[in-house]
Swiss-Prot record:
This is Na(+)-translocating NADH-quinone reductase subunit D. InterPro entries: NqrD (IPR011292), NqrDE/RnfAE (IPR003667). Belongs to the NqrDE/RnfAE family. It catalyses: a ubiquinone + n Na(+)(in) + NADH + H(+) = a ubiquinol + n Na(+)(out) + NAD(+). The lineage of its organism: Bacteria, Pseudomonadati, Pseudomonadota, Gammaproteobacteria, Alteromonadales. The gene is nqrD. PANTHER family: ELECTRON TRANSPORT COMPLEX PROTEIN RNFE, NA(+)-TRANSLOCATING NADH-QUINONE REDUCTASE SUBUNIT D. The chain crosses the membrane at residues 14-34, 42-62, 72-92, 103-123, 131-151, 178-198. GO terms for cellular component: plasma membrane. It is an enzyme of class 7 (translocase).
Length: 210
């Protein structure tokens, strides 16, 4: 049974020390696509965290009964089943957001973070630790998404969660929104900036040269 210290390390590690986007550079495609609004970034974070946590839990519970030759198929079946559940819940209770997220919820099935944690961690670790690892990686993924979404929506549209924060010139205010921040390439540069900041603070994350 894992003690509280181990659980805390597993939960907090992926947020900064081993962030799936900033350090491992996984899940970047969805991070570019769903961060033009803070609302979609938050919902995507919740969706991926739920899938990652519960897929880790179920795969860990089944790990001693899965033949090595079909383990990837079993993992994808578990993940796909959870993604379908999450997608149906979103369409039932948050239809407008589900439409904005489009295919990206479905693509959680092939998300490198979810697949990677299932194969590298859940297949070798007890259920509770695996569950907490899934939550930690989901929060780490979400921390980057929400940071990028905050900057893009605030300075690209002058709002947060659809509520106007910076009064726009077109409405008689003072702020001219930067439309470039609403384009996907801007997310790429913002993520790069976050990675640079994190690696400046934690230089041990910088890859060795040569």
């Amino acid at each position: 049974m894992a003690n509280a210290k181990e659980l805390k390390e597993v939960l907090s590690g992926p947020i900064v020390s081993n962030n799936p986007i900033a350090l491992q550079v996984l899940g970047v495609c969805s991070a570019l696509a769903v961060t033009s609004k803070l609302e979609t970034a938050l919902v995507m974070t919740i969706a991926l965290t739920a899938v990652c946590a519960f897929s880790n839990l179920f795969i860990s519970m089944l790990r001693n009964h899965i033949p090595s030759s079909v383990r990837i198929i079993v993992q994808m079946t578990v993940i796909a089943s959870l993604v379908i559940v999450v997608d149906q819940v979103l369409q039932a209770y948050a239809y407008d957001v589900a439409k904005q997220l489009s295919v990206f919820v479905g693509l959680i099935i092939t998300n490198c973070i979810v697949m990677g944690r299932a194969e590298a961690y859940a297949m070798k670790t007890p259920p509770m630790m695996s569950f907490m690892d899934g939550i930690g990686n989901g929060i780490g993924y979400g921390a980057i998404l929400l940071s990028v979404g905050f900057v893009r929506e605030l300075f690209g549209n002058g709002s947060l969660f659809g509520v106007e924060i910076l009064s726009k010139i077109s409405d008689g205010g003072w702020y001219q929104p930067n439309g470039l921040l609403l384009l996907p390439p801007s997310a790429f540069f913002l993520i790069g900036t976050l990675i640079w900041i994190i690696r400046t603070i934690k230089p041990e994350q910088v890859e060795a040269k040569g």
